[in-house]
Amino acid sequence: MAKIKIGINGFGRIGRLVARVALQSDDVELVAVNDPFISTDYMTYMFKYDTVHGQWKHHEVKVKDSKTLLFGEKEVAVFGCRNPEEIPWGSVGAEYVVESTGVFTDQEKAAAHLKGGAKKVVISAPSKDAPMFVVGVNEKEYKSDINIVSNASCTTNCLAPLAKVINDKFGIVEGLMTTVHAITATQKTVDGPSSKDWRGGRAASFNIIPSSTGAAKAVGKVLPVLNGKLTGMSFRVPTVDVSVVDLTVRLEKSATYDEIKAAVKAEAEGSLKGILGYVEEDLVSTDFQGDSRSSIFDAKAGIALNGNFVKLVSWYDNEWGYSTRVVDLIRHMNSTK
């Protein structure tokens, strides 16, 4: 069977990790990377050495020339175009483009990739107007005539599978989410200007920083039955990877905490295996580093006030889990052709 050929625009945190996922997949082939700000030798260095996920150990990575990287024997074209419509995706056969710059996140901007020969674009961020899909929740609603999609956010990917299970089994009347979230690249190493978000400009390594997030509201887009029932906020904390969702909900149908645990466990071992996880051990954030699942329910951490009011806790590697889902979404899109 022919491999799915993908290109990556933007070789930042998600771009590089999507590349790692793709290069470890038998059915996906990375054919090109575009980044106007990074030379090929620096790309090689950034790919090989990763503070969080460790050194790349699968095969040698080296520069063939200024426009080609070698991953083992595999050649990957490198482009340096600032304007997406100028990237010659068609010349290397890249059918699917992962848009991971964080810049071209609406349909119109992302559509520029189609002019260069790409067939489909997956935006690795929430989008104001592109249809959003969360694998394990609503990917089956994807139709093959949709050319531009959003993989939502890492937090929505954690929250939505859990919310779906709880709503399907017990019904959610309303809920509030807090994500305790690791540092990301948009934050500051020392206090610096951040005119749109004053608190967000404070030193990331020294502060717990309250922040806004659209992740809970976005669940209403991928699960319309929950539209208007969830909202939430974020605390940015001084860790480099792995985040945790605290979902506090009022249930329609009364349930014991043990019944809730059993429902989540059944789905984690059944239809959502590989997407939703379930743990009863006494784990902490670093134990989930490199976990490819979207959401790992922490059975011991949750609490119930009564049969209708519960707090549920679910972990996620906000980098690796999310990057794995980007590739899974591409696989699903390809299967509908």
Curated annotation (Swiss-Prot):
Family matches, as InterPro entries: GlycerAld/Erythrose_P_DH, GlycerAld_3-P_DH_AS, GlycerAld_3-P_DH_cat, GlycerAld_3-P_DH_NAD(P)-bd, Glyceraldehyde-3-P_DH_1, NAD(P)-bd_dom_sf
Annotated segments matching region Catalytic: 152-337
Record-marked site positions (Activates thiol group during catalysis): 181
Highest taxon listed in the record's lineage: Eukaryota
Listed GO biological process terms: glucose metabolic process; glycolytic process; response to anoxia; response to heat
Molecular function GO terms recorded: glyceraldehyde-3-phosphate dehydrogenase (NAD+) (phosphorylating) activity; NAD+ binding; NADP binding; phosphate ion binding
Binding site for NAD(+): 13-14, 35, 82, 318
Gene Ontology annotations for the cellular component aspect, listed alphabetically: cytosol; protein-containing complex
Pathway the protein acts in: Carbohydrate degradation; glycolysis; pyruvate from D-glyceraldehyde 3-phosphate: step 1/5
Reaction(s) catalysed (UniProt annotation): D-glyceraldehyde 3-phosphate + phosphate + NAD(+) = (2R)-3-phospho-glyceroyl phosphate + NADH + H(+)
Coiled coil start-end: none
Enzyme Commission designation: 1.2.1.12
Residues the entry annotates as binding D-glyceraldehyde 3-phosphate: 153-155, 184, 213-214, 236
Alphabetized Pfam families for the sequence: Gp_dh_C (PF02800), Gp_dh_N (PF00044)
SUPFAM superfamilies attached to this UniProt entry: Glyceraldehyde-3-phosphate dehydrogenase-like, C-terminal domain, NAD(P)-binding Rossmann-fold domains
Catalytic residues as annotated in Swiss-Prot or TrEMBL: 154 (nucleophile)
Region (Binding to NAD): 1-151
Keywords: Cytoplasm, Glycolysis, NAD, Oxidoreductase
Secretion signal, residue range per the UniProt entry: none
Localization in the cell: Cytoplasm
UniProt similarity note: Belongs to the glyceraldehyde-3-phosphate dehydrogenase family.
Job description of the protein: Key enzyme in glycolysis that catalyzes the first step of the pathway by converting D-glyceraldehyde 3-phosphate (G3P) into 3-phospho-D-glyceroyl phosphate. Essential for the maintenance of cellular ATP levels and carbohydrate metabolism.
NCBIfam families, per the entry: GAPDH-I (TIGR01534)
Assembly, per entry: Homotetramer.
Other information: Plants contain two types of GAPDH: cytosolic forms which participate in glycolysis and chloroplast forms which participate in photosynthesis. All the forms are encoded by distinct genes.
Protein name: Glyceraldehyde-3-phosphate dehydrogenase 3, cytosolic
Organism: Zea mays
